[in-house]
């Protein structure tokens, strides 16, 4: 009976040893190639030691387990050195070795001159503790950085048209026309924020039908003007709430037809405007304006919520005029249009990932009081600023802009973050005019729609790197003491560009770096892409060998080789 037990134990030990030997051979050959490429020596060194250990274990020699113990210890140290507290950095480096160690400790009593079960299983317990420790690290934040540099003190407002509003107001999507997103209010501090309690809650009641699949997105940013909040729901109903109580003062129902929805119902905000033309005691002296998912521009009285009779047709402007053929949901206004020097500038999203003949990405401006068209900027028709001639449309398939625009009233400029031409992922059919302004910041004259300048953040974008952030305006003194009117534009690439907003020239250093080539016939990529090298990149730092992914040492080794 004892002989049978020994034979079974030896069978398990030899089986384990064979698995370890196969694993070791893979690491040895792969590690040798990695070292040849200039990579880490760990995999080759560990593969050789695991191979020696496996041979001794196959011969039921306890010395094989001692070699493995050395491997485990230095692998643990190496993991801590390379991965720190990054949970997913521990998994490929240590998890497989720890699993081998777990089974090996269970077999320790059955080796020649093996150790007692009590001691062996205490090692097993330590391995289990390691697993729990690694699991605990899964909840620990990693890949985070903290910038401790001081806030620059040389900012000015020489060029700013500062938005006059009380400190506790938030009158624009980005708090002010410059998109600074900064409130000087100081009642809430890091010291008392944990004491905040809910005072009120309100529900818009705008929910998707139970039997429908479209997504409803709660993306609205309410604006606060005096004691009222103004906001829009996912399907463009507008509400005015008492800021202190949350009580609904009025609601404007747009009654958007379900079949006109895009894939996602979303409204990011509304625009508040005090007229310089309409007398104070007349309706719509103060108005709330929104663009809608069914391509309408709507203005309502801020006091009553009633449609402005002077604006368009009964408070509505048809944004489909001049667009030509489209289908419901293919176009939509999702961001609040800004007002600058008496005109309201409107952009819109387009389903630009399906066909080259998608509707135009034209940018248009309307009189903020009457709703009459003031100008249009059509990329392929730069000298035509009105409606297209009868029988024609705005240029189809051109880059659209769907995010929030920024304006500078003193410079009479609207800054438009653009996306790519249709279709998103194939660039061979685009015109040179489109290629110049896709995925770029474009500065337009607010009174005429004439392009002043453009700065491209991605050349010949075929990756849907649309600019999705609002630009922020900031003025500061350069090294010579001159005041520079600046524009800050973050991007999906994690690159942040700082530009002179008068000229569009970079203030921070921008270099062109070599980019991968395309393997798609006739769809040539740009040989270089712009990099803002003076500004810290958002997201991960440059990829290195030690940051390669994997679940086991084998696939991480292959990723390092790749």
Give the label of every model feature segment.
Residues 193-207, 238-260, 274, 278, ...:
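Extracytoplasmic/lumenal domain signature
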Residues 406, 526-562:
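Long, low-complexity segments enriched in small/aliphatic residues
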Residues 177-183, 206-212, 239, 424-425:
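Short, solvent-exposed loop/turn elements at domain surfaces
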Residues 99-145, 240-248, 266-272, 284-323, ...:
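Hydrophobic or amphipathic alpha-helical targeting/insertion segments
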Residues 145-201, 379-384, 550-562:
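Blade/loop signatures of beta-propeller domains
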Residues 1-152:
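Topology signature of small-to-medium multi-pass alpha-helical membrane proteins
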Residues 170-174, 214-235, 262-296, 329-355, ...:
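Repeat-blade elements of multi-bladed beta-propeller folds
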Residues 184-191, 198-230, 255, 323:
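Asp/Glu-centered strand-loop micro-motifs enriched in Gly/Pro and often flanked by an aromatic residue
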């Amino acid at each position: 009976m004892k002989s049978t037990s020994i034979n079974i134990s030896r069978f398990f030990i030899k089986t384990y040893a064979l698995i370890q030997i196969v694993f070791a051979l893979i690491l040895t050959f792969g590690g040798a190639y990695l070292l040849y490429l200039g990579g880490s020596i760990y995999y080759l060194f560990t593969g050789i030691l695991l191979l020696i250990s496996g041979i001794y274990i196959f011969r039921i020699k306890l010395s094989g387990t001692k070699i493995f113990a050395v491997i485990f210890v230095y692998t643990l140290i190496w993991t801590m050195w390379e991965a720190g507290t990054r949970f997913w950095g521990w998994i490929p480096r240590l998890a497989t070795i720890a699993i081998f160690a777990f089974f090996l400790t269970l077999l320790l009593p059955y080796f020649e001159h093996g150790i007692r079960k009590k001691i062996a299983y205490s090692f097993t317990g330590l391995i289990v503790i390691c697993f729990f420790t690694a699991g605990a690290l899964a909840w620990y934040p990693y890949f985070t950085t903290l910038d401790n540099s001081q806030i620059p003190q040389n900012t000015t407002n020489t060029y700013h048209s500062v938005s006059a509003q009380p400190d506790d107001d938030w009158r624009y999507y980005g708090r002010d026309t410059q998109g600074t997103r900064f409130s000087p209010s100081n009642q809430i501090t890091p010291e008392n924020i944990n004491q905040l309690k809910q005072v009120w809650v309100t529900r818009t009641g705008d929910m998707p039908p139970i039997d429908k699949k479209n997504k409803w997105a709660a993306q609205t940013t309410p604006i606060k003007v005096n004691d009222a909040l103004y906001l829009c729901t996912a399907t463009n109903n507008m509400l005015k709430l008492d800021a202190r109580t949350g009580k609904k003062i009025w609601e404007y129902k747009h009654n958007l037809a379900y079949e006109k929805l895009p894939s996602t119902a979303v409204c990011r905000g509304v625009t508040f405007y005090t007229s310089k033309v309409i007398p104070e005691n007349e309706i719509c002296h103060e108005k709330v304006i929104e663009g809608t998912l069914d391509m309408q521009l709507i203005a309502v009285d801020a006091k009553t919520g009633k449609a402005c009779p002077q604006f368009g047709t009964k408070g509505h402007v048809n944004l489909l005029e001049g667009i030509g053929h489209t289908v419901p949901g293919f176009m939509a206004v999702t961001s609040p249009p800004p007002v600058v020097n008496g005109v309201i500038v409107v952009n819109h999203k387009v389903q630009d990932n399906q066909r080259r003949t998608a509707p135009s990405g034209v940018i248009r401006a309307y009189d903020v009081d009457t709703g009459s068209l003031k100008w249009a900027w059509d990329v392929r028709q730069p000298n035509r600023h009105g409606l297209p001639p009868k029988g024609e449309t705005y240029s189809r398939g051109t880059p659209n802009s769907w995010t929030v625009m920024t304006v500078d009233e003193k410079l009479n400029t609207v800054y438009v973050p653009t996306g790519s031409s249709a279709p998103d992922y194939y660039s061979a059919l685009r015109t040179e005019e489109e290629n110049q302004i896709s995925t770029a910041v474009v500065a337009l004259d607010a009174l005429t729609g004439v392009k002043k300048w453009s700065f491209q953040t991605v050349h010949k974008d075929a990756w849907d790197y649309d600019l999705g952030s609002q630009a922020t305006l900031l003025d500061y003194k350069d090294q010579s003491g001159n005041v520079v009117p600046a524009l800050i534009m973050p991007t999906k690439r994690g690159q942040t560009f700082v530009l002179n907003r008068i000229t569009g020239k970079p203030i921070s250093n921008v270099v062109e770096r070599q980019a991968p080539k395309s393997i798609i016939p006739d769809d040539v990529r740009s040989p270089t892409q712009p990099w803002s090298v003076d500004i810290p990149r958002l997201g991960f730092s440059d990829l290195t060998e030690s940051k390669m992914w994997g679940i086991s040492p084998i696939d991480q080794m292959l990723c390092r080789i790749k």
